[in-house]
Regions:
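Acyl-thioester-processing domains in fatty-acid/polyketide/NRPS systems
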Residues: 3-22, 29-366
Length: 366
């Protein structure tokens, strides 16, 4: 290839901040029997390239496929157990599944690259659909982000997660599969954050775990890298609604904190604390509805602070039972000083299977 063109491609590749080895060349003929070539990378604005240059951020951004600043962005990530060890601890019958909370992290990363001067505030109208499962050694996924609207304080970016249908020969066919969707809420630089929507659930009880982590993970499929629940402190109730208080673990407190091959990694969306909320609400669904449940949606997520120390506690309140085995929950996580850290308004869990009789339990409540 011409020197001038090679230099241009080299600079573009460096500015994209990718993590994998890349060869820039002209036609390779028989040297490329596996058809591993791809189009040149997108040109990125300096502020976007500057963010991507931070090694501990954006672990789910392998490359930018499309980018129209402040309008649309499409990022690509290749999921595999070596690069993302947490996948091995989120597997059913040996098949790894991408956790929904990590899809939210993908959305947050794509949205922040679309509006680089903003910071993450939360999520609205999240729906978890077709799961992403690794039936092969690796699975490519794309996060699509596009500008939705803004006001004086916030920018809203809508996101979807998709993957291609691929046959045994490695050929893409048909329309992309749609997995999850949600709206990322970003706070503008210099804007005053409006009063957050915190559910009226009271404060979780203090104390040691009445039911330890072993009790919880006898009932869940999560391995050590995804065992974010530190145990149940007590059963509780809020205005007649059944609730449960527990211990929430930070990533540094997990039984195995190596979730990524390139640790340390900074995550924008506090995904493991959202996961604690799901698991705590799931324990209530097990107890009251006798159902093993998975999250299918969240009405709103409020990210209130990034905790610097442990001692976090969680309370989830079962608000309603809807049709088809769906239960509705609100969740609040607080720090050791009772300051709110994270709020989940309107978590919907879908019952997937009845709880085995030997796994049923009942918490004491006043």
């Amino acid at each position: 290839i011409p020197v001038e063109k090679g230099v241009e491609l080299f600079v573009d590749e460096v500015m994209c901040g990718g993590k994998r080895m890349v060869v820039i060349a002209g036609r390779l003929g028989v040297l490329d029997e596996s058809e591993s070539t791809r189009e040149p990378p997108q040109r990125l604005a300096p502020d976007v390239a500057g963010l991507l240059a931070e090694p501990a951020r954006f672990p789910f951004i392998d490359r930018i496929v499309e980018h129209d600043p402040y309008e649309t962005l499409v990022s690509e990530c290749t999921l595999d157990v070596q690069q993302f060890p947490f996948l091995s601890d989120h597997a059913i019958d040996g098949t790894p599944y991408l956790p929904g909370v990590m899809a939210l992290e993908m959305f947050a990363e794509a949205a922040q690259l679309l509006w680089p001067a903003c910071s993450l505030s939360g999520f609205d109208v999240v729906s978890f659909g077709l799961p992403v499962k690794l039936v092969r050694d690796e699975q490519k996924v794309r996060a699509r982000a596009w500008f939705a609207r803004q006001d004086d304080a916030h920018v809203w970016v809508e996101c979807t997660l998709e993957s291609d249908l691929v046959n045994k020969a490695g050929e893409v066919f048909g329309e992309p599969r749609q997995h999850h969707a949600g709206t990322v809420r970003l706070l503008k630089q210099g804007a005053e954050k409006p009063v957050p929507l915190i559910p009226a659930v009271g404060l979780p009880e203090r104390g040691v775990a009445l039911l330890p982590t072993t009790f919880i993970y006898e009932r869940f499929f999560h391995g050590p890298r995804f065992q974010a629940h530190g145990g149940i402190i007590a059963g509780s109730s809020v205005n007649g609604d059944v609730a449960c208080d527990g211990i929430a673990l930070m990533r540094s407190e997990l039984p195995n904190g190596i979730q990524f091959a390139d640790e340390p990694v900074l995550l924008e969306a506090l995904p493991m604390l959202i996961e604690v909320g799901f698991q705590n609400a799931g324990m209530v669904a097990m107890e009251i509805d006798r159902l093993q449940s998975l999250p299918i949606g969240i009405e709103q997520v409020e990210l209130l602070q990034t905790p610097e120390a442990g001692g976090l506690r969680v309370r989830s309140v079962r608000r309603a039972a809807e049709a088809d085995g769906v239960t509705l929950h609100d969740v609040l996580i607080v720090d050791a000083d009772d300051h709110p850290v994270l709020a989940l308004n309107g978590v919907r869990l879908k019952g997937m299977a009845p709880v085995e009789p030997e796994m049923e339990f009942k918490l004491k409540r006043n």
